[in-house]
Amino acid sequence: MIKRYPTRKIKVGNVDVGGDAPISVQSMTYSKTKDIESTLDQINRLYFAGADIVRVAVLDEEDALALKEIKQKSPLPVIADIHFNYRLGLKAAEVVDGLRINPGNIGGKERVKAIVDACKARKIPIRIGVNAGSLEDHLENKYGQTPKAMVESALWHIKFLEDLDFFDIKVSLKASDVQRTVEAYRMLRPLVDYPFHLGVTEAGTKFHATIKSAAAFGALLLDGIGDTMRVSITGELEEEIKVGKAILKDLGLSKEGVNIISCPTCGRIEVDLPPIVEAVEEATKHIKKPLNLAVMGCVVNAIGEAKEADVAIACGKGYGLIIKKGEIIGKYKEEELLEKFLEEVKKESE
């Protein structure tokens, strides 16, 4: 069992982050926030995909003014992403559930203090978001875009807020590659007790982002590091949630949903297995109950693998077997096998 680092618990709307709270999965809309209809449409898509928290960009006054209606209609806690203009942070803090800022680019201490005071008044948290590509000049000149520079930046920003008597803090340390990201989080973890937001920034398209995020998050989460996370994908929003939840499930940190076991295929296979597995994935993606399903291309491996599965199919030429909890319950023609299998899955999911 993974032993998580003890961190202080904060609240983002109705979602606990840190402490003994489940690791939450979040994403960010890509619409112009001032386009309220499009932004809410994306938030609803994320909600139905299983997201826990959403972040929106606030670039100008119109974006800030749109936040009130978005927050009122959003099914998810809303975090506002603020850069450079502290006045936008003040307006956002009046209505949203949290801010993401870089204290170093907001302006002088008085401006940061104004934002902190606004967040204190509503008891909403601030995420300090450090990115390797946008470090302070003096740190980059001294260390380069290294984990050490990222950690020093985070510690400086944390102290900045602590000196203002503010402690509802989350921290992220993102680079665009796995090694620097993992090293930075590992370096900072023993030094503070604030919850960590995990992410690999600019991770790329679905394929590359999935690989990078699984590698980085897997390494960190197995070490007990991480309280909330975003898989950054250049692509559809729902994929970020799908991949994030799959990472948590495969690490044993989430019990929700279906786990599909399928063979990689070999010379024994006598059916076209990939379309069958894809059909099972599509038909079961809505199931919340934890179920192990096995889709095997021959009888040789199926009997053994099926012992671990709630429901399994062993596909053969012209026919196949359905197995429940290690017991064969039926033999069916190939053309009806998938339908019969899904009927048994539905029974188990109810």
From Swiss-Prot:
Cited NCBIfam families: ispG_gcpE, PRK00366.1
Family: Belongs to the IspG family.
Superkingdom, natural source: Bacteria
Gene name per UniProt: ispG
Catalytic activity annotation: (2E)-4-hydroxy-3-methylbut-2-enyl diphosphate + oxidized [flavodoxin] + H2O + 2 H(+) = 2-C-methyl-D-erythritol 2,4-cyclic diphosphate + reduced [flavodoxin]
Note describing how the cofactor binds: Binds 1 [4Fe-4S] cluster.
Function: Converts 2C-methyl-D-erythritol 2,4-cyclodiphosphate (ME-2,4cPP) into 1-hydroxy-2-methyl-2-(E)-butenyl 4-diphosphate.
Binding site for [4Fe-4S] cluster: 263, 266, 298, 305
Example of a GO MF term: 4 iron, 4 sulfur cluster binding
Cofactor requirements of the protein: [4Fe-4S] cluster
Protein name: 4-hydroxy-3-methylbut-2-en-1-yl diphosphate synthase (flavodoxin)
Pathway entry: Isoprenoid biosynthesis; isopentenyl diphosphate biosynthesis via DXP pathway; isopentenyl diphosphate from 1-deoxy-D-xylulose 5-phosphate: step 5/6
UniProt-listed Enzyme Commission number(s): 1.17.7.3
Pfam families: GcpE
Organism per entry: Nautilia profundicola (strain ATCC BAA-1463 / DSM 18972 / AmH)
Tagged with keyword Protein biosynthesis: no
InterPro entries: Dihydropteroate_synth-like_sf, Enolase-like_C_sf, IspG_bac, IspG_bac-typ, NO2/SO3_Rdtase_4Fe4S_sf
UniProt xrefs under HAMAP family: IspG
GO biological process, one term: isopentenyl diphosphate biosynthetic process, methylerythritol 4-phosphate pathway
